[in-house]
Amino acid sequence: MPAHLDAIDWKILKEMQDDGRITNVELARRVGISAPPCLRRVRALEEAGFIKGYRAVLDEKLLGYEVTVFAMVHLTSQAEPDLKAFEDFVRKEPLVRECWMLSGEIDFVLKCVAPDLKTFQAFVAELTGAPHVRNVKTSLTLRNSKDEAIVPLPAK
């Protein structure tokens, strides 16, 4: 798949992002091509990495995760092995939903969920004791005004 996407590819990406459960037949109808070439295009988009995967979006509150917290982490070292060690630690933590390395004063920001504050406090104690962690500052969320797991696509 070339890096250049044509208008049909963009339509496929938009439709699939809007509804990941769409059938190939319906997708083909919406983008204006027949089913076999539509499926070939979807496979090519997957192989090229434009489509990274498929999953259900779950409601964490209904599943008992009442607390969402952002943790700002400062490390004692920014040497690449130390950064990788911290990232490896975070990948193993089920309460961490996202981990972003930043430029500036904060090295990493983590988006975490927990069933309650006591569970999150226990995680913070573990996080603070992780290798190369200088300090951790947290901010408890009050509400979420926007949560879209989509990529803005240009109108084609």
Q: Model segments located where?
A:
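A compositional/biophysical signature of low hydrophobicity enriched in polar/charged and small residues
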Residues: 1-156
